[in-house]
């Protein structure tokens, strides 16, 4: 039986994901820069209602800045824009792996002038099956009509589509329509996309277990590895594969820990409360399994 990828399209924000930039060298206070990016003039500029000259003049007036300061601000940031090569390579790998089964679209709240600058950068734009700019559409994310227009244009259903974006509002709007959302920065986007697109989850899980055989130990949220028999016995019960686990056998009563190093962590004041909590959670899990 042929297995079909459950998702047919990915919408990817260009700014800060496909392309990155830095505001470290700007002369204005960072809070002023953030306010500029969120102001009404920026929204009008990104929707194509005003051109760059009008936009800069509005910002100078609204924020009591000189036109030279506004121009220098954006010139400084623009000079730092770079393609995110590793992410582009990942997108190319996806396109190669899934072929025509998966479409990739760029979406951005961006002016035509800014997009023209990005187009001059050396990336393979053929990766994208289409580009949707707020300036061309006269609407921006997170407006519902923006997503409706894109989905209608590409003839896809929300449930078949993934949005990768760096703005929580955009993700929440997409989720409300039925799209799958991945918030950039909160997780590894390549890993999250792989998890969604790789349909054979059982095979992936089995591969993970085999590649980490004998090392499937409990780890605290601070990165402390706890070698103990309880988790090993749970894995053995679930999989029936003795080659996956590391057990310390005892002739009669079993020790909870494997070796002495893990048990000595209990003596460390910093870990005592955490270990007590972890032990309680494991015991509750064991009770539920047995029940």
From Swiss-Prot:
- EC class, as a word, reads lyase
> What reaction gets catalysed by this protein?
(2E,6E)-farnesyl diphosphate = (S,S)-drim-8-en-11-yl diphosphate
**At the top level of its lineage, which domain of life is listed?**
Eukaryota
Any idea of its EC number? 4.2.3.-
Q: Which UniProt keywords apply?
A: Lyase
Molecular function via GO = lyase activity
Induction of its expression: Expression is regulated by the secondary metabolite regulator cclA.
Q: Does the keyword Secreted apply?
A: no
Q: Where is the signal peptide?
A: none
InterPro entries in UniProt: HAD-like_sf, HAD_sf, PGP-like_dom2
- List this protein's GO terms for biological process: terpenoid biosynthetic process
Q: Which residues cross the membrane?
A: none
The task this protein performs is described as: Sesquiterpene cyclase; part of the gene cluster that mediates the biosynthesis of astellolides, drimane-type sesquiterpene esters that show antimicrobial, anti-inflammatory, and anti-tumor activities. The first step in astellolide biosynthesis is performed by the sesquiterpene cyclase astC that catalyzes the formation of drimanyl pyrophosphate from farnesyl pyrophosphate. Drimanyl pyrophosphate is then dephosphorylated by the sesquiterpene phosphatase astI to produce drimanyl monophosphate which is further dephosphorylated to drim-8-ene-11-ol by atsK.
What's this protein's family per the entry?
Answer: Belongs to the HAD-like hydrolase superfamily.
Q: What is this protein called?
A: Sesquiterpene cyclase astC
- The scientific name of the source species is Aspergillus oryzae (strain ATCC 42149 / RIB 40) (Yellow koji mold)
